[in-house]
Each structure stands twice: as C-alpha cells, then as structure tokens.
C-alpha cells in the first residue's frame, strides 16, 4: 500500500491566534478534516494534531503543528519520518504576504519569502522541495511591521471573505492531491 500524503496547515496554537492572518493554514486544515468526517487527535510522537483518512481518492494525513509557527518543523519532521513521507509528498498550506488578499497559488519548492514557518519546515525536512498551497493575505498598509500584521485578526471587510477563501484553498488542496501539481495549477491559477 502506498504511503499517505502529508498535508500540513501552518498556524499558531491557542484562541488568541485563531482568527489571525497567520492562521489561514489551520483554518483550511480544519475544513479538510471536516470533509474527511474526522476530528483531530494528538499524535504522540510528534506533538501535532492529526486526522487520517481519504481525501480526493488518496490516503492522507492532515496535520496541525501544536507549537508556534516559527517552530513548525519540530513537529512536521517527525511526522514525515513516522509516516515515511518524502518531501515531494508533503503539502504545506500557509499564508503569503506576497499575494493579494484571497489569491491562491500552488507551487513546489522555492524560497520561503521570509516565512519563518516555511523555513522551519524546510530545515526539518532538509529540503525545500515540498508542495505549497499559498493563500494571499496581502501586504501590510503603510510602514506597518509585517511580523505584527500577520498576527492581527482579519479586518471586518476581509473577515466576510475568509470562509470562501478557505473553502477555495481546501478545493485547491484536493485538486493538488487528485491531479498533481501542473494540472491543479492550471485550474487553480485561472480562478
């Protein structure tokens, strides 16, 4: 039997961060778990919360690291090892300052764009060659510090669109699982 794909939503644990821009990865992971009809449970060896089952016809483990974003690799690395998942079979869902709010893009590899959660995952895996579902949160206004911006809640105007954006990101993740990168990019990047 083929090893599962590992889908990781990045975010920060705790109610204080639940509605922040940095937590869209967690929001999408929650939607994927609901689509699988499962609830997250603790994975003792890694410390992350996981759901395992089928998604888009494949065996999948969806994970939410329960450490802070900048330390995500500390739990993603052990999960990948436990399930024998190579970097190319890992999908990381994360916020992206370099994309306009609501834009979704798929890619594999590349730089981290200053995203310390991605950097932590890359370091833990010893590779940047994992798949990514990038969810645009836009740039901070004026001279606002990007580190502070990502930890703020969405504005009331943005908040109205977040559920739809997260549903689209979950759809994009399922297309990536079902079709592979290039065919999924062709569809998602046309949205």
From Swiss-Prot:
This protein's GO CC annotations: cytoplasm
Stored InterPro entries: Pept_tRNA_hydro, Pept_tRNA_hydro_CS, Pept_tRNA_hydro_sf
Site (Discriminates between blocked and unblocked aminoacyl-tRNA): residue numbering on this chain: 12
EC number of the protein: 3.1.1.29
GO MF term (any one): tRNA binding
Subcellular location, principal: cytoplasm
Record keywords: Cytoplasm, Hydrolase, RNA-binding, tRNA-binding
Catalytic activity: an N-acyl-L-alpha-aminoacyl-tRNA + H2O = an N-acyl-L-amino acid + a tRNA + H(+)
Signal peptide stretch: none
Active-site residues from the entry: 22
Subcellular location: Cytoplasm
Any Pfam family matching the protein: Pept_tRNA_hydro
Positions bound to tRNA: 17, 68, 70, 116
Family of this protein: Belongs to the PTH family.
Subunit description: Monomer.
Functional description taken from the UniProt entry: Hydrolyzes ribosome-free peptidyl-tRNAs (with 1 or more amino acids incorporated), which drop off the ribosome during protein synthesis, or as a result of ribosome stalling.
Protein name per the record: Peptidyl-tRNA hydrolase
Organism: Mycobacterium avium (strain 104)
Lineage per the UniProt record: Bacteria, Bacillati, Actinomycetota, Actinomycetes, Mycobacteriales
Gene assigned in the entry: pth
């Amino acid at each position: 039997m083929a090893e599962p794909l590992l889908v990781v939503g990045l975010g920060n644990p705790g109610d204080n961060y639940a509605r922040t821009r940095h937590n869209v990865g967690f929001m999408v992971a929650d939607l994927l778990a609901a689509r699988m009809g499962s609830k997250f449970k603790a994975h003792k060896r890694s410390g992350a919360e996981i759901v395992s089952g089928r998604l888009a016809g494949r065996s999948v483990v969806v994970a939410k690291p329960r450490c802070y974003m900048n330390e995500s690799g500390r739990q993603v690395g052990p999960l990948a090892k436990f399930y024998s998942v190579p970097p190319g079979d890992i999908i990381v869902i994360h916020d992206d300052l370099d994309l306009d709010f609501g834009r979704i893009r798929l890619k594999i590899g590349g730089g981290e764009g200053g995203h310390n959660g991605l950097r932590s995952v890359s370091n833990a895996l010893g590779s940047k060659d994992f798949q990514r579902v990038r969810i645009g949160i836009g740039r901070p206004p004026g001279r606002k510090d990007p580190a502070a911006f990502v930890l703020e809640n969405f504005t009331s105007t943005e908040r109205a669109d977040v559920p739809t954006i997260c549903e689209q990101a979950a759809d994009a993740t399922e297309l990536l699982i079902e079709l592979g990168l290039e065919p999924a990019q062709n569809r998602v990047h046309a949205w």
